[in-house]
Amino acid sequence: MAKISVSRLTKMKQDNQKITCMTAYDASFAAIFDQAGIQVLLVGDSLGMVLQGHDSTLPVTVDDIRYHTAAVVSTAKSAFIIADLPFMSYSTPEMSYENAAILMRAGANMVKMEGGEWLTDSVKGLVERGIPVCGHLGLTPQSVNIFGGYKVQGREEEQADELLNDALLLQEAGIQLLVLECVPVSLADRITTALKIPVIGIGAGCETDGQILVMHDAFGVSAGFCPKFSKNFLLETGDIRQAVTLYIDQVESRQFPSAEHSFY
C-alpha cells in the first residue's frame, strides 16, 4: 500500500470517504494498525495516561513523544503519522519550531497542537518552515485544569460559535487537519461542513470526516474509566486484528459512533 499523504486525506473528505485513525505508541501495534489499513496513526500525549499511569497528559515530555514516534515509524510504512506536541512545548512560536523539528526528525509527518486563535502565529511559522500542522479543538486535555475536568465543550451557543471561529482561523493560518473532541454532534457537523480540511472526531458524532480512538479504549484495556464515546471492539471479536478490522468497517459504514457514543 502506498504511503498516505495529507492530500490523499483531503481527497477522501472531498469524496465523502471516512478516514480511520488510531493512537499508537509502539512498533508492534503500529504494524498491526498499518497492515489493517488504518490511514492515520497519532502518537498522542495520551500515552501519559495509558502507558505511564498519570491522571492527565500534562507530565508528558517532548522526548517521550520523540521516543514513541520513532518506534511507530519503524513499522508503519503506509499510515500517515501525527505526533503530539505536549503540554507547554509550544507556548511561543520559537518553542513550537524547535520542538516540532525534534518530532519531525523522529519520523512524524505532522505535529498536533491544542488550542484556538492564540496558536495562529505558531501555525503560520511552522507551515512556512515546512512542518505540517494538525489542530485540536473542543475538549483539549492539556487544558483540563481550566475546564475543571473532562467535560463536553460547545453546548452553549457562544462557546459553539467561538469554536467554529477558531477552526476557521486555524484553517486560514495553515492547519491541514483538525481533531475535534467531545462536542455536540450538531456543532461537529457545522465545523466539518465549514472547513475544507478533514475533521477527525473523537466524541463528536458520525458527521465528521473521520474518527480516532485511543487504542486502549478501543480494546477495552484502559485502567478504570472508559469514555462514553468509545467502544470495546475486542469484546465483539476476541482478536486484536479482527477488532481493528471491525473498527474500520463500522467507521466506514457510519455504524460507529452511534447515538450512544455521541453528545447532543
Curated annotation (Swiss-Prot):
Biological-process GO terms, alphabetical: pantothenate biosynthetic process
Catalytic center residues: 181
GO cellular component terms, semicolon-separated: cytoplasm
Subcellular localization: Cytoplasm
Main location: cytoplasm
Secretion signal span: none
Cofactors named for this entry: Mg(2+)
Keyword annotations of the record: Cytoplasm, Magnesium, Metal-binding, Pantothenate biosynthesis, Transferase
Domain of life: Bacteria
Presence of keyword Hydrolase: no
Cofactor: binding comment: Binds 1 Mg(2+) ion per subunit.
PANTHER family assigned: 3-METHYL-2-OXOBUTANOATE HYDROXYMETHYLTRANSFERASE
Family, as annotated: Belongs to the PanB family.
Role summary: Catalyzes the reversible reaction in which hydroxymethyl group from 5,10-methylenetetrahydrofolate is transferred onto alpha-ketoisovalerate to form ketopantoate.
Protein name per UniProt: 3-methyl-2-oxobutanoate hydroxymethyltransferase
Lineage summary: Bacteria, Pseudomonadati, Pseudomonadota, Gammaproteobacteria, Alteromonadales
